[in-house]
Amino acid sequence: MTAGWDVMNKGLSGSCLCEREVADYLAELSVDVLSLVIGVNMVIFFDEEETCKRVEYLLETLKKSRARDIFVIDMFPNKGLIALDQDSAYYRHYRSFKEIVRQTVLKVGDHRFHLVKGEEILKNFTYLSTDLLHPSDNGHIRMGANLADQLTGRGKGVLQHERAI
């Protein structure tokens, strides 16, 4: 089954920090659909205030995009949910960063923006490798299928995700 899309990956694996230059570049792309995963890379570098500024700039800038749909995926479940070290940045920031993304999508107020919860893509911890942060090979496959379901409207999360109005 295919959605009939020509996909171009502009992912910045392990290094995306919602930089202004990246936001400006993505806003200029001639695409029908954008999908973004925001969160985990910034957890160890930034506090909530800086994360909020970066996410706001990214999403406000993407309002200039010609994309008809912009799917914003918040942080995937990871070791931050089960960390015993409550001083760990992953533990402290997991929930607050997800909330920042959610609130910012709503604040943007553009019907093209769709919030997809990370747990709709990474549905359980068996998708992760032993570091409980990065997907395993099988996890990548399952996450890809779940993402395709979300983007094409076949996933149950599409009905449950919050749409900015």
Segment roles from a protein language model:
Residues 20-165:
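Alpha-helical cap/lid subdomain in secreted, periplasmic
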